[in-house]
Amino acid sequence: MKTRINDSIQQHQVYPCSYTSIHIVDWKKFTSENLKVHDRVPVNPNTGKLIHSVCLRNDSAMSILVDAFVENALQYSKKKKARQCECVIYPDNYKDTDWVLFVEMKYAENEIAAFRKENDYPNNMIEQIKQTVQFFKDKCILPQEKEVYAIVSFPNLLSAFNSTIFSIDAINDFYLDYGIIIRGTNNAEIISSDNIKLIG
């Protein structure tokens, strides 16, 4: 998987990790840095406050790779690019039967901002996930029939928000149409190389 990604995507940063608690933060809103991976909730150096994250519970300390995309990384050609999510995550010794998780994050300050109609964050985030997964399949990074997981995350929202974004029918339709198991959540649990649970 890593080799196939490297062959198709030049602008990306890979973070190997085996933390039992994996915290993924998009630093663009806080500093000039991009996405980073931490073993604990990080602190904003400008304010001293904790920064909320996407958290992956990894009790077995399994080795995984978090592959973060630089802006405009998914290029079909010089003139055509795919919209992209923040990162893709997968087991270090990936096999095609293993799970793959795509993550898109928005640091909306509160629920009102997250779901304000004119911002249209949920639909934009879902489209970024769809186009990223399609790029991976178009470039043969993933098989066309591969089922994948996806998280639409609002790290600053501490209460459950999946049902605000997706009805049960919408989740089922998304899976049937695109082969993507998607949830609105900030949390997941890595069970094994072929099993991951989206919490929310």
Model feature map: region roles:
Residues 87-89, 99-111:
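Conserved catalytic cores of phosphodiester-cleaving nucleases, focusing on short active-site segments
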Residues 154-200:
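Short, low-complexity, polybasic intrinsically disordered segments
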Residues 112-121, 160-163:
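Short, flexible/disordered intra-domain loops and linkers
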Residues 116-153:
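Catalytic cores of nucleic-acid endonucleases
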Residues 59, 63, 71-74, 141-145, ...:
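Electrostatic, structured charged patches in enzyme active sites and in nucleic-acid/phosphate-binding
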Residues 68-78, 83-92, 115-120, 133, ...:
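Short secondary-structure capping micro-motifs at structural edges
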Residues 1-82:
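Basic, amphipathic N-terminal segments that precede the first structured/catalytic domain
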Residues 95:
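Phosphate/adenylate-binding glycine loop and adjacent helical scaffold
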